[in-house]
Amino acid sequence: MDYLVKALAYDGKVRAYAARTTDMVNEGQRRHGTWPTASAALGRTMTASLMLGAMLKGDDKLTVKIEGGGPIGAIVADANAKGEVRAYVSNPQVHFDLNEQGKLDVRRAVGTNGTLSVVKDLGLREFFTGQVEIVSGELGDDFTYYLVSSEQVPSSVGVGVLVNPDNTILAAGGFIIQLMPGTDDETITKIEQRLSQVEPISKLIQKGLTPEEILEEVLGEKPEILETMPVRFHCPCSKERFETAILGLGKKEIQDMIEEDGQAEAVCHFCNEKYLFTKEELEGLRDQTTR
């Protein structure tokens, strides 16, 4: 079962998050029909976005957008404080041979010439936006760079996805380790050593380690678990939302749809759900609109 934990370690000097996201990423793969390299890029982004979302409170939410100039195009993910994520890639059917390390070549798919941006909606008039250059294209390093440079928190982000031969997801998950102000050098050195030796996160998930056990493996001590929450792929789109969008087009455009196709199909970018509007429904919407 997928879930996320929030924890503290080293007497509160270290804040940590870890998640198993295999089912969540599998749902993203199923909905978008991503090929393996695209699945890894989408899954890593979803997992990192989930953990960033877990740092929010209440009804706050955020959007992550990665545009690295690679063949995959843009990756966009929405996450909230409730463990819900939805995401898509511009070009889901991207796959390359494994890289020199024998891993899915995410860097080649994402590209290294572009930006990673995070827009937070904290319920205020203004959105908070942070943007950094892509430094690696492998995504874990890029989210690390975002946290360090845009949010000024010394951090380490690990995200990983393993894909089955039939394109379904074998394992997915991630962790974020953050140092609180005033962390002593001894603690920093110990954590850096652990991070340099730890197995890839996807391998730890595949072995069956829980998020709690992953943090213990990464931190070198048993963390204090503050909160556990279920996580899932969730898109709040609905036919009503698309009705509102169609109404916004105005009478003439709706009439054009009726005359040209006799119906309309709306597709949600984020979850690929399709909504069909019949001729009668379109006529009803046309008659409702004042534009």
Curated annotation (Swiss-Prot):
GO terms for molecular function: protein folding chaperone; unfolded protein binding. GO terms for cellular component: cytoplasm. GO terms for biological process: protein refolding. Its main location: cytoplasm. Signal peptide: none annotated. Under oxidizing conditions two disulfide bonds are formed involving the reactive cysteines. Under reducing conditions zinc is bound to the reactive cysteines and the protein is inactive. Gene3D superfamilies: Hsp33 domain, HSP33 redox switch-like. It holds the Pfam family HSP33. Keywords: Chaperone, Cytoplasm, Disulfide bond, Redox-active center, Zinc. It is found in: Cytoplasm. InterPro entries: Heat_shock_Hsp33, Heat_shock_Hsp33_C, Heat_shock_Hsp33_N. SUPFAM superfamilies: Hsp33 domain, HSP33 redox switch-like. Disulfide bonds join C235-C237, C268-C271. Belongs to the HSP33 family. Redox regulated molecular chaperone. Protects both thermally unfolding and oxidatively damaged proteins from irreversible aggregation. Plays an important role in the bacterial defense system toward oxidative stress. This is 33 kDa chaperonin. The lineage of its organism: Bacteria, Bacillati, Bacillota, Bacilli, Bacillales.
